[in-house]
Protein backbone atom coordinates (compact mmCIF):
# COMPACT_ATOMS: atom_id res chain seq x y z
CA UNK A 1 0.00 0.00 0.00
CA UNK A 2 1.28 3.45 -0.86
CA UNK A 3 1.01 6.31 1.65
CA UNK A 4 1.19 9.98 0.82
CA UNK A 5 1.36 12.87 3.25
CA UNK A 6 0.62 16.52 2.74
CA UNK A 7 3.26 18.69 4.38
CA UNK A 8 2.94 22.42 5.09
CA UNK A 9 5.43 24.99 3.95
CA UNK A 10 8.31 26.31 5.99
CA UNK A 11 8.20 26.25 9.74
CA UNK A 12 7.38 29.67 11.16
CA UNK A 13 7.97 31.44 14.46
CA UNK A 14 4.98 32.31 16.68
CA UNK A 15 3.16 35.48 15.65
CA UNK A 16 0.14 37.05 17.35
CA UNK A 17 -3.08 36.01 15.61
CA UNK A 18 -5.75 38.51 14.57
CA UNK A 19 -7.91 37.45 17.58
CA UNK A 20 -5.03 38.16 19.96
CA UNK A 21 -4.45 41.48 18.24
CA UNK A 22 -8.12 42.54 18.72
CA UNK A 23 -8.14 41.45 22.34
CA UNK A 24 -4.93 43.27 23.04
CA UNK A 25 -5.99 46.53 21.41
CA UNK A 26 -9.48 46.56 22.96
CA UNK A 27 -8.14 46.03 26.45
CA UNK A 28 -5.06 48.21 26.21
CA UNK A 29 -5.40 51.60 27.89
CA UNK A 30 -1.77 52.51 28.37
CA UNK A 31 1.70 51.30 27.62
CA UNK A 32 1.79 49.44 30.93
CA UNK A 33 -1.56 47.81 30.28
CA UNK A 34 -0.42 46.81 26.76
CA UNK A 35 2.67 45.15 28.18
CA UNK A 36 0.62 43.26 30.77
CA UNK A 37 -1.84 42.03 28.17
CA UNK A 38 0.96 40.82 25.87
CA UNK A 39 2.57 38.94 28.74
CA UNK A 40 -0.81 37.36 29.52
CA UNK A 41 -1.28 36.38 25.86
CA UNK A 42 2.12 34.68 25.89
CA UNK A 43 1.15 32.77 29.01
CA UNK A 44 -2.17 31.72 27.44
CA UNK A 45 -1.05 30.83 23.94
CA UNK A 46 -3.61 29.31 21.59
CA UNK A 47 -2.97 25.77 20.43
CA UNK A 48 -1.89 25.37 16.83
CA UNK A 49 -5.16 23.78 15.72
CA UNK A 50 -7.22 26.69 17.10
CA UNK A 51 -4.91 29.13 15.34
CA UNK A 52 -5.44 27.33 12.04
CA UNK A 53 -9.22 27.33 12.57
CA UNK A 54 -9.26 30.97 13.78
CA UNK A 55 -11.17 30.14 16.98
CA UNK A 56 -10.55 30.97 20.65
CA UNK A 57 -8.65 28.24 22.45
CA UNK A 58 -9.57 27.24 26.03
CA UNK A 59 -5.84 26.86 26.86
CA UNK A 60 -6.33 23.49 28.59
CA UNK A 61 -3.12 21.51 29.20
CA UNK A 62 -1.80 19.29 27.75
CA UNK A 63 -4.43 19.59 24.97
CA UNK A 64 -7.37 21.92 24.61
CA UNK A 65 -10.94 20.68 25.09
CA UNK A 66 -12.11 22.39 21.89
CA UNK A 67 -9.88 20.08 19.80
CA UNK A 68 -11.10 17.07 21.78
CA UNK A 69 -14.74 18.01 21.21
CA UNK A 70 -14.05 18.37 17.47
CA UNK A 71 -12.50 14.89 17.38
CA UNK A 72 -9.06 16.31 16.52
CA UNK A 73 -5.79 15.48 18.23
CA UNK A 74 -4.57 18.73 19.76
CA UNK A 75 -1.15 19.68 18.33
CA UNK A 76 -0.16 21.57 21.51
CA UNK A 77 1.26 25.00 22.28
CA UNK A 78 4.95 24.75 21.27
CA UNK A 79 6.90 27.65 19.75
CA UNK A 80 7.35 25.78 16.48
CA UNK A 81 4.34 24.62 14.51
CA UNK A 82 4.31 20.82 14.31
CA UNK A 83 4.12 19.14 10.91
CA UNK A 84 0.59 18.44 9.82
CA UNK A 85 0.33 14.97 8.24
CA UNK A 86 -2.81 14.23 6.29
CA UNK A 87 -3.73 10.72 5.21
CA UNK A 88 -4.57 10.34 1.53
CA UNK A 89 -6.09 7.31 -0.15
CA UNK A 90 -3.58 5.23 -2.15
CA UNK A 91 -3.12 6.68 -5.62
CA UNK A 92 -4.61 10.07 -4.73
CA UNK A 93 -2.50 13.15 -5.52
CA UNK A 94 -3.40 16.68 -4.38
CA UNK A 95 -0.98 18.56 -6.59
CA UNK A 96 1.61 17.91 -9.25
CA UNK A 97 4.02 20.25 -10.96
CA UNK A 98 4.01 18.82 -14.50
CA UNK A 99 6.27 21.37 -16.08
CA UNK A 100 8.92 21.23 -13.42
CA UNK A 101 9.05 17.42 -13.42
CA UNK A 102 9.12 17.24 -17.21
CA UNK A 103 11.90 19.77 -17.43
CA UNK A 104 13.82 17.90 -14.76
CA UNK A 105 13.47 14.61 -16.61
CA UNK A 106 14.53 16.17 -19.89
CA UNK A 107 17.60 17.71 -18.27
CA UNK A 108 18.41 14.42 -16.55
CA UNK A 109 18.02 12.27 -19.69
CA UNK A 110 20.03 14.76 -21.73
CA UNK A 111 22.80 14.69 -19.14
CA UNK A 112 22.86 10.89 -19.09
CA UNK A 113 22.83 10.66 -22.88
CA UNK A 114 25.64 13.19 -23.18
CA UNK A 115 27.72 11.48 -20.53
CA UNK A 116 27.14 8.08 -22.13
CA UNK A 117 28.08 9.35 -25.56
CA UNK A 118 31.25 10.86 -24.17
CA UNK A 119 32.08 7.59 -22.46
CA UNK A 120 31.89 5.48 -25.62
CA UNK A 121 34.97 6.65 -27.52
CA UNK A 122 37.48 6.00 -24.73
CA UNK A 123 35.93 2.55 -24.24
CA UNK A 124 36.49 1.63 -27.88
CA UNK A 125 40.21 1.31 -27.22
CA UNK A 126 39.49 -0.89 -24.19
CA UNK A 127 37.26 -3.07 -26.34
CA UNK A 128 40.02 -3.29 -28.97
CA UNK A 129 42.57 -4.47 -26.42
CA UNK A 130 40.14 -6.98 -24.95
CA UNK A 131 39.14 -8.33 -28.36
CA UNK A 132 42.70 -8.75 -29.65
CA UNK A 133 44.05 -10.18 -26.40
CA UNK A 134 41.28 -12.64 -25.55
CA UNK A 135 38.52 -13.12 -28.10
CA UNK A 136 40.81 -13.11 -31.13
CA UNK A 137 43.15 -15.50 -29.34
CA UNK A 138 40.24 -17.93 -28.91
CA UNK A 139 39.17 -17.59 -32.54
CA UNK A 140 42.60 -17.80 -34.20
CA UNK A 141 42.86 -21.64 -34.05
CA UNK A 142 39.83 -21.82 -36.37
CA UNK A 143 42.12 -20.60 -39.17
CA UNK A 144 43.80 -24.01 -39.03
CA UNK A 145 40.61 -25.50 -40.48
CA UNK A 146 40.70 -23.06 -43.37
CA UNK A 147 41.08 -19.33 -43.75
CA UNK A 148 38.18 -17.59 -42.01
CA UNK A 149 37.24 -14.35 -43.86
CA UNK A 150 35.46 -12.85 -40.85
CA UNK A 151 38.15 -13.34 -38.20
CA UNK A 152 40.87 -10.71 -38.24
CA UNK A 153 43.03 -8.59 -35.99
CA UNK A 154 41.58 -5.19 -35.11
CA UNK A 155 44.32 -2.83 -36.26
CA UNK A 156 44.50 0.91 -35.47
CA UNK A 157 43.16 1.57 -38.97
CA UNK A 158 40.14 -0.64 -38.35
CA UNK A 159 39.69 1.02 -34.97
CA UNK A 160 39.46 4.42 -36.66
CA UNK A 161 36.84 3.02 -39.01
CA UNK A 162 34.92 1.64 -36.03
CA UNK A 163 34.63 5.10 -34.51
CA UNK A 164 32.79 6.24 -37.64
CA UNK A 165 30.10 3.54 -37.55
CA UNK A 166 26.76 4.18 -35.80
CA UNK A 167 26.82 4.28 -32.03
CA UNK A 168 24.64 1.18 -31.64
CA UNK A 169 27.17 -0.96 -33.52
CA UNK A 170 30.08 0.30 -31.42
CA UNK A 171 28.25 -0.16 -28.13
CA UNK A 172 26.94 -3.53 -29.26
CA UNK A 173 30.49 -4.77 -29.83
CA UNK A 174 31.53 -3.44 -26.43
CA UNK A 175 28.62 -5.38 -24.89
CA UNK A 176 29.85 -8.50 -26.67
CA UNK A 177 33.35 -8.19 -25.19
CA UNK A 178 32.03 -7.43 -21.69
CA UNK A 179 29.66 -10.40 -21.87
CA UNK A 180 32.52 -12.60 -23.06
CA UNK A 181 34.58 -11.49 -20.07
CA UNK A 182 31.72 -12.09 -17.62
CA UNK A 183 31.16 -15.62 -18.88
CA UNK A 184 34.86 -16.41 -18.84
CA UNK A 185 34.98 -15.34 -15.19
CA UNK A 186 31.85 -17.29 -14.35
CA UNK A 187 29.82 -14.24 -13.37
CA UNK A 188 27.12 -16.31 -11.65
CA UNK A 189 29.64 -17.59 -9.11
CA UNK A 190 31.79 -14.44 -8.98
CA UNK A 191 29.96 -11.62 -7.14
CA UNK A 192 33.09 -9.46 -7.28
CA UNK A 193 32.57 -8.85 -11.00
CA UNK A 194 29.52 -6.62 -10.53
CA UNK A 195 31.33 -3.68 -12.13
CA UNK A 196 31.38 -5.62 -15.42
CA UNK A 197 27.63 -6.14 -15.16
CA UNK A 198 27.08 -2.41 -14.58
CA UNK A 199 29.23 -1.50 -17.57
CA UNK A 200 27.44 -4.06 -19.70
CA UNK A 201 23.98 -2.64 -18.98
CA UNK A 202 25.16 0.94 -19.47
CA UNK A 203 26.38 0.11 -22.98
CA UNK A 204 23.38 -2.11 -23.63
CA UNK A 205 21.14 0.86 -22.86
CA UNK A 206 23.18 3.05 -25.21
CA UNK A 207 22.83 0.42 -27.94
CA UNK A 208 19.05 0.21 -27.59
CA UNK A 209 18.59 3.99 -27.44
CA UNK A 210 20.82 4.66 -30.44
CA UNK A 211 19.18 1.96 -32.57
CA UNK A 212 15.72 3.25 -31.63
CA UNK A 213 16.67 6.72 -32.82
CA UNK A 214 17.87 5.29 -36.14
CA UNK A 215 14.77 3.16 -36.48
CA UNK A 216 12.51 6.17 -35.99
CA UNK A 217 13.92 7.81 -39.13
CA UNK A 218 11.61 6.64 -41.92
CA UNK A 219 14.17 6.37 -44.73
CA UNK A 220 16.61 4.40 -42.52
CA UNK A 221 14.34 1.74 -41.04
CA UNK A 222 15.12 -0.95 -43.60
CA UNK A 223 18.74 0.01 -44.26
CA UNK A 224 21.64 -2.45 -44.11
CA UNK A 225 23.00 -0.83 -40.99
CA UNK A 226 19.68 -1.19 -39.11
CA UNK A 227 19.54 -4.89 -40.02
CA UNK A 228 23.12 -5.18 -38.73
CA UNK A 229 22.14 -3.36 -35.53
CA UNK A 230 19.18 -5.61 -34.78
CA UNK A 231 21.27 -8.69 -35.54
CA UNK A 232 23.93 -7.39 -33.12
CA UNK A 233 21.27 -7.09 -30.40
CA UNK A 234 19.94 -10.53 -31.29
CA UNK A 235 23.38 -12.10 -30.89
CA UNK A 236 23.83 -10.20 -27.63
CA UNK A 237 20.57 -11.67 -26.33
CA UNK A 238 21.68 -15.16 -27.31
CA UNK A 239 25.11 -14.67 -25.74
CA UNK A 240 23.36 -13.53 -22.57
CA UNK A 241 21.35 -16.74 -22.31
CA UNK A 242 18.54 -16.20 -24.83
CA UNK A 243 15.72 -14.86 -22.71
CA UNK A 244 12.32 -14.49 -24.36
CA UNK A 245 13.16 -11.10 -25.92
CA UNK A 246 15.59 -12.58 -28.46
CA UNK A 247 12.75 -14.08 -30.49
CA UNK A 248 11.17 -10.65 -31.01
CA UNK A 249 14.43 -9.42 -32.53
CA UNK A 250 14.55 -12.44 -34.86
CA UNK A 251 10.98 -11.75 -35.99
CA UNK A 252 11.86 -8.09 -36.48
CA UNK A 253 14.77 -8.91 -38.79
CA UNK A 254 12.60 -11.28 -40.82
CA UNK A 255 10.06 -8.49 -41.31
CA UNK A 256 12.79 -6.07 -42.42
CA UNK A 257 14.15 -8.65 -44.85
CA UNK A 258 10.63 -9.14 -46.23
CA UNK A 259 10.29 -5.38 -46.73
CA UNK A 260 13.54 -5.48 -48.73
CA UNK A 261 12.16 -8.18 -51.06
CA UNK A 262 12.97 -11.32 -49.09
CA UNK A 263 16.04 -13.53 -48.75
CA UNK A 264 16.22 -14.34 -52.44
CA UNK A 265 16.43 -10.64 -53.31
CA UNK A 266 19.16 -9.93 -50.74
CA UNK A 267 21.23 -13.11 -51.15
CA UNK A 268 23.41 -11.76 -54.03
CA UNK A 269 24.54 -8.82 -51.86
CA UNK A 270 28.15 -9.42 -50.81
CA UNK A 271 28.07 -6.84 -48.03
CA UNK A 272 25.06 -8.57 -46.45
CA UNK A 273 26.46 -12.09 -46.91
CA UNK A 274 27.78 -12.57 -43.34
CA UNK A 275 24.57 -11.14 -41.88
CA UNK A 276 22.26 -13.34 -43.95
CA UNK A 277 24.47 -16.36 -43.36
CA UNK A 278 24.21 -15.84 -39.60
CA UNK A 279 20.48 -15.19 -39.80
CA UNK A 280 19.84 -18.31 -41.89
CA UNK A 281 21.69 -20.51 -39.46
CA UNK A 282 19.95 -19.09 -36.38
CA UNK A 283 16.58 -19.55 -38.07
CA UNK A 284 17.23 -23.17 -39.00
CA UNK A 285 18.68 -24.16 -35.62
CA UNK A 286 15.90 -22.38 -33.73
CA UNK A 287 13.31 -24.40 -35.64
CA UNK A 288 14.95 -27.63 -34.48
CA UNK A 289 14.99 -26.95 -30.74
CA UNK A 290 11.38 -25.91 -30.31
CA UNK A 291 7.98 -27.61 -30.06
CA UNK A 292 6.24 -28.23 -33.38
CA UNK A 293 3.49 -25.86 -32.23
CA UNK A 294 5.98 -22.96 -32.42
CA UNK A 295 7.03 -23.61 -36.02
CA UNK A 296 6.16 -20.69 -38.26
CA UNK A 297 5.58 -21.07 -42.00
CA UNK A 298 6.72 -17.49 -42.65
CA UNK A 299 10.11 -18.40 -41.19
CA UNK A 300 10.52 -21.85 -42.70
CA UNK A 301 9.53 -20.68 -46.16
CA UNK A 302 12.89 -18.95 -46.37
CA UNK A 303 14.72 -22.25 -45.95
CA UNK A 304 12.62 -24.90 -47.66
CA UNK A 305 14.37 -24.51 -51.04
CA UNK A 306 17.45 -26.57 -50.20
CA UNK A 307 19.20 -26.05 -53.54
CA UNK A 308 18.95 -22.29 -53.20
CA UNK A 309 20.17 -22.46 -49.61
CA UNK A 310 23.17 -24.63 -50.45
CA UNK A 311 24.14 -22.32 -53.28
CA UNK A 312 24.35 -19.28 -51.01
CA UNK A 313 25.37 -21.02 -47.80
CA UNK A 314 28.09 -23.44 -48.90
CA UNK A 315 30.73 -20.73 -49.12
CA UNK A 316 30.42 -20.23 -45.38
CA UNK A 317 30.49 -23.84 -44.24
CA UNK A 318 34.13 -23.51 -43.27
CA UNK A 319 34.23 -20.05 -41.77
CA UNK A 320 30.92 -19.90 -39.97
CA UNK A 321 29.31 -22.90 -38.34
CA UNK A 322 31.13 -25.97 -39.67
CA UNK A 323 27.75 -27.55 -40.33
CA UNK A 324 28.10 -29.59 -43.58
CA UNK A 325 25.75 -27.89 -46.08
CA UNK A 326 24.27 -31.20 -47.26
CA UNK A 327 23.26 -32.08 -43.71
CA UNK A 328 21.99 -28.58 -43.00
CA UNK A 329 19.73 -28.88 -46.04
CA UNK A 330 18.31 -32.10 -44.58
CA UNK A 331 17.70 -30.33 -41.27
CA UNK A 332 15.75 -27.70 -43.16
CA UNK A 333 13.63 -30.44 -44.77
CA UNK A 334 12.96 -32.00 -41.37
CA UNK A 335 11.79 -28.64 -40.03
CA UNK A 336 9.38 -28.31 -42.92
CA UNK A 337 8.17 -31.88 -42.46
CA UNK A 338 7.40 -31.17 -38.79
CA UNK A 339 5.39 -28.16 -39.90
CA UNK A 340 3.42 -30.30 -42.36
CA UNK A 341 2.74 -32.87 -39.65
CA UNK A 342 1.31 -30.13 -37.46
CA UNK A 343 -1.44 -29.56 -40.05
CA UNK A 344 -2.14 -33.12 -41.20
CA UNK A 345 -5.42 -32.20 -42.86
CA UNK A 346 -3.48 -31.29 -46.00
CA UNK A 347 -1.13 -34.27 -46.03
CA UNK A 348 -1.48 -38.02 -45.70
CA UNK A 349 0.48 -39.76 -42.94
CA UNK A 350 1.96 -42.28 -45.39
CA UNK A 351 3.32 -39.48 -47.57
CA UNK A 352 5.01 -37.80 -44.59
CA UNK A 353 6.44 -41.07 -43.33
CA UNK A 354 7.93 -41.88 -46.73
CA UNK A 355 9.57 -38.44 -46.89
CA UNK A 356 10.96 -38.92 -43.38
CA UNK A 357 12.62 -42.24 -44.24
CA UNK A 358 14.08 -40.72 -47.40
CA UNK A 359 15.58 -37.87 -45.37
CA UNK A 360 17.02 -40.31 -42.82
CA UNK A 361 18.55 -42.38 -45.61
CA UNK A 362 20.18 -39.27 -47.13
CA UNK A 363 21.60 -38.27 -43.74
CA UNK A 364 23.14 -41.67 -43.06
CA UNK A 365 24.51 -41.80 -46.61
CA UNK A 366 26.54 -38.65 -46.00
CA UNK A 367 30.27 -39.45 -46.10
CA UNK A 368 32.50 -37.48 -43.69
CA UNK A 369 35.54 -38.89 -45.49
CA UNK A 370 34.49 -37.55 -48.88
CA UNK A 371 33.53 -34.22 -47.35
CA UNK A 372 36.94 -33.92 -45.67
CA UNK A 373 38.78 -34.59 -48.93
CA UNK A 374 37.61 -31.25 -50.31
CA UNK A 375 39.31 -29.40 -47.45
CA UNK A 376 42.85 -28.09 -47.70
CA UNK A 377 43.92 -28.63 -44.10
CA UNK A 378 43.06 -30.45 -40.86
CA UNK A 379 41.34 -33.29 -42.67
CA UNK A 380 41.08 -35.37 -39.48
CA UNK A 381 39.23 -32.53 -37.78
CA UNK A 382 36.89 -32.24 -40.73
CA UNK A 383 36.20 -35.99 -40.69
CA UNK A 384 35.36 -35.81 -37.00
CA UNK A 385 33.13 -32.74 -37.56
CA UNK A 386 31.28 -34.55 -40.34
CA UNK A 387 30.85 -37.68 -38.22
CA UNK A 388 29.51 -35.72 -35.25
CA UNK A 389 27.05 -33.72 -37.32
CA UNK A 390 25.86 -36.77 -39.26
CA UNK A 391 24.91 -38.56 -36.05
CA UNK A 392 23.42 -35.43 -34.49
CA UNK A 393 21.30 -34.79 -37.59
CA UNK A 394 20.14 -38.42 -37.69
CA UNK A 395 19.08 -38.19 -34.04
CA UNK A 396 17.18 -34.99 -34.76
CA UNK A 397 15.40 -36.63 -37.68
CA UNK A 398 14.26 -39.67 -35.71
CA UNK A 399 13.45 -38.07 -32.35
CA UNK A 400 11.67 -34.96 -33.64
CA UNK A 401 9.58 -36.83 -36.23
CA UNK A 402 8.62 -39.50 -33.72
CA UNK A 403 7.35 -36.69 -31.51
CA UNK A 404 4.84 -35.62 -34.20
CA UNK A 405 3.94 -39.24 -35.11
CA UNK A 406 5.56 -39.14 -38.54
CA UNK A 407 7.99 -41.95 -37.64
CA UNK A 408 7.03 -44.91 -35.44
CA UNK A 409 8.57 -45.61 -32.05
CA UNK A 410 9.82 -49.07 -32.97
CA UNK A 411 12.87 -51.09 -31.95
CA UNK A 412 14.66 -50.58 -35.29
CA UNK A 413 14.69 -46.79 -34.95
CA UNK A 414 15.57 -47.08 -31.25
CA UNK A 415 18.62 -49.14 -32.22
CA UNK A 416 19.65 -46.47 -34.72
CA UNK A 417 19.36 -43.80 -32.03
CA UNK A 418 21.51 -45.83 -29.65
CA UNK A 419 24.21 -46.22 -32.32
CA UNK A 420 24.24 -42.51 -33.18
CA UNK A 421 24.31 -41.61 -29.48
CA UNK A 422 27.37 -43.82 -29.00
CA UNK A 423 29.08 -42.14 -31.97
CA UNK A 424 28.54 -38.73 -30.36
CA UNK A 425 29.75 -39.98 -27.00
CA UNK A 426 32.89 -41.30 -28.67
CA UNK A 427 33.81 -38.20 -30.71
CA UNK A 428 32.49 -35.24 -28.71
CA UNK A 429 35.14 -35.34 -25.94
CA UNK A 430 37.94 -34.77 -28.45
CA UNK A 431 35.93 -32.21 -30.41
CA UNK A 432 35.14 -30.25 -27.23
CA UNK A 433 38.75 -30.30 -26.07
CA UNK A 434 40.02 -28.89 -29.39
CA UNK A 435 40.37 -25.11 -29.64
CA UNK A 436 39.62 -25.46 -33.36
CA UNK A 437 36.24 -27.15 -33.05
CA UNK A 438 34.83 -26.72 -29.52
CA UNK A 439 32.66 -23.67 -30.29
CA UNK A 440 30.79 -25.61 -32.99
CA UNK A 441 29.74 -28.51 -30.77
CA UNK A 442 26.79 -27.04 -28.84
CA UNK A 443 24.01 -28.34 -31.09
CA UNK A 444 25.44 -31.91 -31.26
CA UNK A 445 25.88 -31.83 -27.47
CA UNK A 446 22.23 -30.80 -27.03
CA UNK A 447 21.17 -33.66 -29.34
CA UNK A 448 23.14 -36.10 -27.21
CA UNK A 449 21.43 -34.62 -24.15
CA UNK A 450 17.96 -35.24 -25.58
CA UNK A 451 18.91 -38.81 -26.52
CA UNK A 452 20.32 -39.26 -22.98
CA UNK A 453 16.76 -39.44 -21.61
CA UNK A 454 16.73 -42.98 -23.06
CA UNK A 455 20.26 -43.91 -21.90
CA UNK A 456 22.24 -44.22 -18.68
CA UNK A 457 23.13 -41.59 -16.08
CA UNK A 458 26.75 -41.48 -17.27
CA UNK A 459 25.72 -39.85 -20.55
CA UNK A 460 23.64 -37.25 -18.72
CA UNK A 461 26.55 -36.54 -16.37
CA UNK A 462 28.88 -36.04 -19.34
CA UNK A 463 26.50 -33.54 -20.98
CA UNK A 464 25.87 -31.67 -17.70
CA UNK A 465 29.59 -31.34 -17.09
CA UNK A 466 30.53 -30.23 -20.60
CA UNK A 467 27.94 -27.44 -21.00
CA UNK A 468 29.21 -25.14 -18.17
CA UNK A 469 32.79 -25.72 -19.29
CA UNK A 470 31.81 -24.78 -22.84
CA UNK A 471 30.15 -21.61 -21.54
CA UNK A 472 33.30 -20.47 -19.72
CA UNK A 473 35.59 -21.51 -22.55
CA UNK A 474 33.73 -19.72 -25.35
CA UNK A 475 32.34 -16.80 -23.32
CA UNK A 476 28.59 -17.19 -23.78
CA UNK A 477 25.70 -18.14 -21.47
CA UNK A 478 23.68 -20.13 -24.00
CA UNK A 479 25.23 -23.50 -22.97
CA UNK A 480 23.98 -22.82 -19.43
CA UNK A 481 20.50 -22.33 -20.86
CA UNK A 482 20.86 -25.67 -22.64
CA UNK A 483 21.93 -27.30 -19.38
CA UNK A 484 18.85 -25.97 -17.59
CA UNK A 485 16.51 -27.12 -20.38
CA UNK A 486 17.99 -30.63 -20.53
CA UNK A 487 18.09 -31.18 -16.77
CA UNK A 488 14.43 -30.14 -16.50
CA UNK A 489 13.62 -32.57 -19.31
CA UNK A 490 15.44 -35.45 -17.62
CA UNK A 491 13.63 -34.79 -14.35
CA UNK A 492 10.19 -34.55 -15.99
CA UNK A 493 9.85 -38.25 -16.78
CA UNK A 494 8.83 -37.37 -20.36
CA UNK A 495 10.71 -38.64 -23.41
CA UNK A 496 9.32 -37.03 -26.56
CA UNK A 497 11.28 -34.33 -28.39
CA UNK A 498 8.57 -31.67 -28.12
CA UNK A 499 8.39 -32.21 -24.35
CA UNK A 500 12.01 -31.12 -23.99
CA UNK A 501 11.53 -27.59 -25.34
CA UNK A 502 8.83 -25.31 -23.94
CA UNK A 503 9.70 -22.59 -26.47
CA UNK A 504 12.24 -21.94 -29.27
CA UNK A 505 15.92 -21.94 -28.24
CA UNK A 506 18.80 -20.69 -30.44
CA UNK A 507 21.54 -23.15 -29.53
CA UNK A 508 24.30 -21.49 -31.54
CA UNK A 509 27.60 -20.14 -30.24
CA UNK A 510 28.14 -17.21 -32.61
CA UNK A 511 28.56 -14.03 -30.55
CA UNK A 512 29.21 -11.43 -33.26
CA UNK A 513 28.86 -10.83 -36.98
CA UNK A 514 31.14 -9.03 -39.42
CA UNK A 515 29.58 -5.64 -40.23
CA UNK A 516 32.66 -4.09 -41.82
CA UNK A 517 31.09 -4.09 -45.30
CA UNK A 518 27.73 -2.71 -44.23
CA UNK A 519 27.09 0.73 -45.66
CA UNK A 520 25.69 3.59 -43.60
CA UNK A 521 22.82 5.45 -45.29
From Swiss-Prot:
CDD domains: GAL4. One of its GO terms (cellular component) is nucleus. Keywords: DNA-binding, Nucleus, Transcription, Transcription regulation, Zinc. InterPro entries: Fun_TF, Zn2Cys6_DnaBD. Residues 46-76 bind DNA. Coiled coil: none annotated. GO terms for molecular function: DNA-binding transcription factor activity, RNA polymerase II-specific; transcription cis-regulatory region binding; zinc ion binding. Its main location: nucleus. It is found in: Nucleus. GO terms for biological process: positive regulation of transcription by RNA polymerase II. Disruption phenotype: Leads to reduced expression of genes for the polyketide synthase PKS2, the cytochrome P450 monooxygenase P450, the alcohol dehydrogenase/quinone reductase YogA, the lipid transport exporter superfamily member RTA1 and the a major facilitator superfamily transporter MFS, as well as a marked reduction in phomenoic acid production. The keyword Protein transport does not apply. The keyword Iron does not apply. Transmembrane segments: none annotated. Transcriptional regulator; part of the gene cluster that mediates the biosynthesis of phomenoic acid, a long chain aliphatic carboxylic acid that does not appear to be essential for pathogenicity but may play a role in allowing to outcompete other fungi in the environmental niche via its antifungal properties. Positively regulates the expression of the cluster and subsequent production of phomenoic acid. This is Phomenoic acid biosynthesis cluster-specific transcriptional regulator.
